Amino acid sequence: MKVLLTGACGFVGSALAEAIAAAGLGWEMTGFDNLGRPGSELNRRRLAQFGVKLRHGDLRCQSDVDALPAADWIVDCAANPSVLAGADGQTSSRQLMEHNLIGTLHMLEKCKREQAGFILLSTSRVY
């Protein structure tokens, strides 16, 4: 089974990758992350220990998504969960839409092309 984890270096993505590896299922895991958050580099090193092949890129960029290997399942853990969007001066509402909507659409289109399954973990922004 080939699994692609987006947001692999984030809190949820890295924990999921570790759990899959610990289950001993023999799944081939590819992680995809923009490495933009604090702690991403630490998680990157940890993922390598679990056999996750990490690809650096941006799911908002179609060419980055197109360069990813085919998968049987895509688990979309990538998101910008900022509840302070627009208020913190660092994250705009547009950036949230690009990450959380356009990026997800790119992954859904990849699933359709490859006939892969899809799991969306979503964000705290769905309330």
What are these regions (language model features)?
Residues 1-127:
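N-terminal Rossmann-like NAD(P)+-binding domain of SDR-like oxidoreductases, especially those catalyzing
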